[in-house]
Amino acid sequence: MVDRPVIQYVVEEGLASGADEVVIVNSRDKKSIEKHFSPDTELVATLRARGKDAYADEVERVGNLNVSYVYQDEPLGLGHAIHCAAEKTADEPFFVLLGDVIVPDNNICPRMLEVSRAHGGASVIAVLPVPDEQVHRFGIIDGAPVEGENGVWKVNSLVEKPALEDAPSNLSVFGRYLLSARVMELLADAKPTVGGEIQLTDALDAVLAEEEMYAVVISDEDGFDTGTVETWLDTNNKLYARKNG
């Protein structure tokens, strides 16, 4: 994405949020991701010998980011992938950052953490307003604005890809979550549902019956989608303009 892999944006966002460690849920055959975040003394030495110290510094920095890995041996859904990292979260709240969206200014997770702390450690999700014609493509929240808290909603329920006439709002789940430890417990007992997969949405619905959940409304200037060819190209253009404007 312009000058770095999408996964690097996501890792750097996670570390900038104050997380102690970024855990990548990987498949065992995707060694290129692990290589990217591993020290490469040979490449660093070659770059320095050629007078490319700035590039060498960047390779060195990326190779020393605090990243670890767990493996999802079967593609059993997002909920299953998250639970693969259960031992890493150690019964504590945790962020989930999906790799098909990026937040170049690293400004969403700190806001989510602030809202969670203001509401007793509640789970918080990021949501993005979408046009009516796109509502059916996303998970949509049902809820209401919190009085006195600009851009914060209390979530009542989540509706997965509703028809426009059934949508309770136009606020789509964006791919940034700050989740309580209870969500991980629920994922441990979750059964496959749609498509034979373990869905995160099911665990979020279950936790809503026990705990409060809030949403932080973001704008399309805060986060960018890379999940389709069209959005990938659009995001590249926007980021290039930002860097060279």
Language model: regions and residue ranges:
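Conserved core of the sugar-phosphate nucleotidyltransferase
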Residues: 103-185, 190, 194
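A short acidic, often aromatic-flanked loop/helix-cap motif at beta-alpha or helix-coil junctions
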Residues: 74-78, 132-134, 164-166, 222-224
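Short, surface-exposed amphipathic charged segments that create phosphate/polyanion-binding patches used
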Residues: 83-86, 138-143, 173-174, 230-234
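Conserved alpha/beta core of the MobA/IspD/sugar-nucleotide pyrophosphorylase nucleotidyltransferase superfamily
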Residues: 151-154, 168-245
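Active-site acidic Asp-centered loop
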Residues: 97-99
